[in-house]
Curated annotation (Swiss-Prot):
The protein's enzyme class: transferase
Protein function: Catalyzes the methylthiolation of N6-(dimethylallyl)adenosine (i(6)A), leading to the formation of 2-methylthio-N6-(dimethylallyl)adenosine (ms(2)i(6)A) at position 37 in tRNAs that read codons beginning with uridine.
EC nos: 2.8.4.3
Protein's cellular compartments: Cytoplasm
A Pfam cross-reference name: TRAM
Substrates-to-products reaction catalysed: N(6)-dimethylallyladenosine(37) in tRNA + (sulfur carrier)-SH + AH2 + 2 S-adenosyl-L-methionine = 2-methylsulfanyl-N(6)-dimethylallyladenosine(37) in tRNA + (sulfur carrier)-H + 5'-deoxyadenosine + L-methionine + A + S-adenosyl-L-homocysteine + 2 H(+)
Organism, scientific name: Finegoldia magna (strain ATCC 29328 / DSM 20472 / WAL 2508)
Annotated TRAM domain residues: 398-461
Gene3D superfamilies: Methylthiotransferase, N-terminal domain, tm_1862 like domain
Protein name from the UniProt record: tRNA-2-methylthio-N(6)-dimethylallyladenosine synthase
Domain MTTase N-terminal: 25-143
Binding site for [4Fe-4S] cluster 1: C34, C70, C104
Name of the coding gene: miaB
Keywords: 4Fe-4S, Cytoplasm, Iron, Iron-sulfur, Metal-binding, S-adenosyl-L-methionine, Transferase, tRNA processing
SMART domains referenced in this protein's UniProt entry, alphabetically: Elp3
Length: 461
């Protein structure tokens, strides 16, 4: 009954808005952070459109603006505050405008306090587990005229709504949320809570529904997918789930994100080599190459065990490609430690790397470490890391020259409407000159050019 009341209240708001302004209220969602946040934003989009909101063409010019925030990096946090500040005058000119802030930042008390004290233009604050309460929160704010906050944690994952995704052929399916690892630099377990897994039945139902809608490339999403199933009443391994999803008729490609190196089992590695829809690509963050740094990070694997798993993956999955996350300048990192990181980069031969200077996150254990590395040293190491990584990316892409690759055409190039972009099974970005009729299709493409970050192809029969 409560759900129906929420819908009635929110529809009343939309109807009132239409009567006042003679058009439906518009919305804009500004998303910071990881693929989990992107997926959450799609859920918010679905709720708003079901209420009667229409998407705005302008990010910072809409009747309802939602900021989906990230807490992992300080610069993402600062961007949100800057964008909120820019809306102060706009809100004064348009008092009917609604502003909401959600996501990982809002799971921490200090960030919520800053919003309360410095950004009175914000109307609604909600957490990562409270997205489905948005209709009710809108109504509460309109009734009270005051800031409404809902960050209460839930013990289950609510994934019942049919999500309206931004891409019609490539999509993400959330299989779990939270993390139990508590790496010393990471705020995620505090923001998203402990691991919770969706049921196999719920996941398979969503995958089948997406395939029926035309989706061809699906990524199973979680903070640490290799821990999937441990919290279920009848525990299931991630390998068992992957096998069941692989069997869904009509699905073309299957991926997963993200994996923790300590949890990748021999069973999973073997399955990746046998399951025909599982793509030859894995994102495997190693963060640092030094065992002493890894221990201080509480990663619970060593440089040697990481490289051993990489070799097993290379043997099991023909042509597999690797991407990773790397942090330089972690507290206590010496030049010798940094050289260990460069050694891993050279030995693995990554196709892509997300590289970061360590930045302190209040509330994490590493923030309390006394031996912080100077900023200029961090910057120097980041630049030297990229000097090693970029030539590897270049040589990896060069190896595709003249080969025929299966490419799923995903949409128009941002730079040239006559060029479409797509991905190979190994997650290589390919620019292909063809018309829009090929969007959503798998096409054989000959690679004729490249740079460090993308390939250029021509369609072949």
């Amino acid at each position: 009954m409560e759900e129906n009341n929420d819908k009635l209240a929110t529809n009343s708001y939309v109807n009132l808005f239409i009567n006042r302004h003679e058009h439906a209220p518009t919305y804009s969602i500004i998303t910071h952070g990881c693929q989990m946040n992107e997926h959450d934003s799609e859920k918010i989009k679905t709720l708003l459109e079901n209420m009667g909101f229409e998407k705005s063409d302008e990010k910072l010019d809409a009747d309802f603006i939602i900021f989906n925030t990230c807490l992992v990096r300080e610069n993402a946090e600062m961007k949100v505050y800057g964008q909120l500040g820019a809306l102060k005058n706009l809100k004064r000119e348009n008092p009917d405008m609604l502003i909401a802030v959600c996501g990982c930042m809002m799971q921490t008390g200090p960030a919520r306090d800053i919003i309360r004290e410095k950004y009175p233009q914000v109307d609604i604050v909600f957490g990562v587990n409270n997205i489905n309460s948005l209709p009710y929160l809108i109504d509460r704010h309109l009734s009270s005229g005051k800031l409404v906050v809902d960050i209460e944690r839930k013990d289950d994952i609510d994934e019942d709504i049919t999500i309206k995704r931004d891409n019609e052929y490539v999509g993400y399916v959330n299989i779990m949320t939270g993390c139990n690892n508590f790496c010393t630099y990471c705020i995620v377990p505090y923001a998203r809570g402990r691991e919770q897994s969706r049921s196999v039945e719920s996941i398979l139902s969503e995958v089948k529904r997406m395939v029926d809608q035309g989706y061809k490339d699906i990524t199973l999403l979680g903070q640490n997918v290799n821990s999937y199933g441990k919290t279920l009443e009848n525990p299931v391994t991630f390998t068992e789930l992957l096998t069941k999803v692989n069997d869904v008729e009509g699905l073309e490609r299957l991926r997963f994100l993200t994996s923790h190196p300590k949890d990748i089992s021999d069973e999973l590695i073997e399955a990746m080599g046998k399951l025909d829809k599982v793509c030859e690509n894995i994102h495997l963050p190693f963060q640092a190459g030094s065992n002493s740094v890894l221990e201080r990070m509480h990663r619970r694997y060593t440089k040697e065990s990481y490289l051993e798993k990489v070799e097993k993956l290379k043997k099991s999955v023909k042509g597999i490609t690797f991407s990773t996350d790397i942090i330089v300048g972690f507290p206590g990192e010496t030049e010798e430690d940094f050289q260990d990181t460069l050694d891993v980069v050279r030995k693995v031969g990554y196709e892509q790397a997300f590289t970061f200077k360590y930045n302190r996150r209040p509330g994490t254990k590493a923030d309390l470490f006394e031996d912080q590395v100077d900023e200029d040293v961090k910057q120097d190491r980041l630049e030297r890391l990229l000097d090693v990584a970029y030539p590897i990316f270049y040589e990896k892409n060069k190896s595709y020259l003249g080969t025929i690759q299966e490419v799923l055409i995903e949409g128009e190039s941002k730079n040239n409407p006559e060029v479409m972009t797509g991905r190979t099974r190994t997650f290589k970005l390919v620019n292909v000159k063809c018309d829009k009729s090929y969007i959503g299709k798998l096409v054989n493409t000959k690679i004729v050019d490249f740079n460090s970050f993308a390939l250029t192809g021509e369609m072949v029969d």
